[in-house]
Regions:
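Beta-rich carbohydrate-recognition modules and glycan-binding surfaces
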Residues: 22-186
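Intrinsic low-complexity, intrinsically disordered segments enriched in polar/basic residues
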Residues: 1-3, 20-23
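Bacterial N-terminal signal peptides that target proteins for export
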Residues: 2-12
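Bacterial N-terminal signal peptides
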Residues: 10-20
Length: 186
């Protein structure tokens, strides 16, 4: 009986180790279910004197949960952005090759911003653009397509250094209207 108990304990520990290592290798993804407002923050150029207006709401339609970012982006007063951002847990995207996002919108161009351990100043980020359509689409962007915001940053992003991801309406006067059903790393 004692030998059987030890064998079961060893098997149980092996299963725990295998499942925890598998879980550690899963990459971050968010489908905006289960209190997304605790993971995502909205802010605009008003933090630096700009006058862009916007908001983010979380909802669902036809069984699909999503974040909905709307607003007016204005470049007056050296502004020009509204943004939805999420902090990325350390080591949760170490093996990532890129970012994917399931979106629909108003036909405008939007941006993904990644901040890393090396983006120390508020205006530093890595950026990639995508166009929205009125139908749901999944856009995949390799990390190699992200462009640094300045020469002080490394040319290439190391996945293990990623600290946050942002979805941004940026850079020109326009109306923003974007729904995001899922975002993650691949």
């Amino acid at each position: 009986m004692m030998i059987l108990g030890r064998r079961m304990l060893k098997i149980g520990l092996a299963v725990l180790l295998i499942s925890s290592s598998t879980t550690a290798e899963e990459l971050m993804k968010d489908n905006f279910e289960s209190q997304p407002e605790t993971r995502w923050s909205y802010f605009s150029d008003q933090v630096m004197g700009g006058i862009s207006q916007g908001r983010v709401t979380f909802g669902s339609q036809d069984g699909e949960s999503f974040a909905h970012m709307t607003g007016q982006v204005s470049t007056e007063n050296n502004g020009g952005f509204i943004q939805l951002r999420r902090v990325i847990a350390k080591n949760s995207v170490d093996s990532a090759a890129g970012v994917y996002i399931k979106v629909r919108g108003n036909g405008q161009q939007y941006y993904l911003h990644l901040r890393t351990a090396g983006t120390l100043l508020p205006w530093q980020y890595y950026q990639a653009s995508f166009a929205s359509t009125s139908d749901w689409q999944t856009v995949r962007v390799p990390l190699s397509d992200f462009v640094r915001s300045g020469n002080w940053l490394s040319k290439a992003i190391r996945a293990s250094s990623i600290r946050s991801i942002g979805i941004v309406a940026y850079g020109r006067d326009h109306s923003a209207d974007l729904q995001i059903a899922e975002i993650g790393f691949y």
